[in-house]
Regions:
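Beta-strand residues in well-ordered beta-sheet regions across diverse protein folds
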Residues: 108-109, 148
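Metal-dependent nuclease catalytic regions and adjoining charged, substrate-binding loops involved
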Residues: 2-4, 123-124, 135, 139-200
Length: 200
């Protein structure tokens, strides 16, 4: 078999089994840290179907599966996977990785060495991950979360504890409501990050 043919077969398989979704019928809680204008555009137009996105999705799901097996066999998790749906609108959804035996939310994040070192140095979760678990806790009724960071390059682990902040949870819900209102009106909401197309 020619090397080029072999490489094409591998990539074709990854594309077919990556689990990458170009478009969803809901707004993911994991993206509520993003600019409302970007969330609106993603909901309306979807995400580009690139080989990079397929590769990253496949790798992410593969590492997550391995990590969940470790956590279950280590006696850390009592359950794996759960869909959280906002009571006020089922278009706000999230999928958690699991719950500890104590009932805390668990979120697994695989990151590069650079980001892993940044987390170790600060002792804190990355901003978008922090907001993500705050959203899960707000809509899912959790009081505590454990973010398990896994370095993709050397498989180091680091756990960051995050406590629920009701005030922030309310802000996240208000933002989610604004995004849905914009979707219903078919009008892009104001940019809050100064990087999206809406700000130009």
């Amino acid at each position: 078999m020619l090397a080029a043919d072999l490489q094409n077969r591998i990539m074709n398989y990854i594309r077919a089994h990556s689990g990458f979704e170009t478009k969803r019928t809901y707004v993911g809680m994991s993206h509520l840290s993003e600019c409302p204008a970007d969330q609106f555009t993603t909901f309306r137009d979807g995400l580009p179907e690139t080989d990079y996105n397929h590769r990253m999705a496949y790798l992410g799901y593969a590492l997550e599966t391995v990590e969940k097996a470790i956590l279950v066999n280590a006696g850390v998790l009592r359950s794996v996977g759960r869909e959280i749906v906002a009571e006020f609108d089922n278009r706000i959804r999230g999928h958690i990785d699991g719950e500890t035996v104590d009932g805390d939310l668990v979120e697994i994040k695989t990151v590069s060495t650079v980001r892993f070192e940044r987390i170790l140095e600060s002792g804190k979760a990355l901003r978008d991950h922090f907001t993500q678990v705050q959203a899960y806790m707000h809509f899912g009724g959790y009081r505590h979360a454990e973010i398990i960071y896994v370095c993709r390059d050397d498989f180091r682990h680091h756990v960051v504890h995050v406590a629920y902040q009701p005030g922030l949870g309310e802000q996240i819900e208000a933002k989610a409501r604004r995004v849905l209102a914009a979707i219903d009106e078919g009008r892009q909401p104001p940019c809050e990050c100064r990087r999206s197309d809406a700000s130009k």
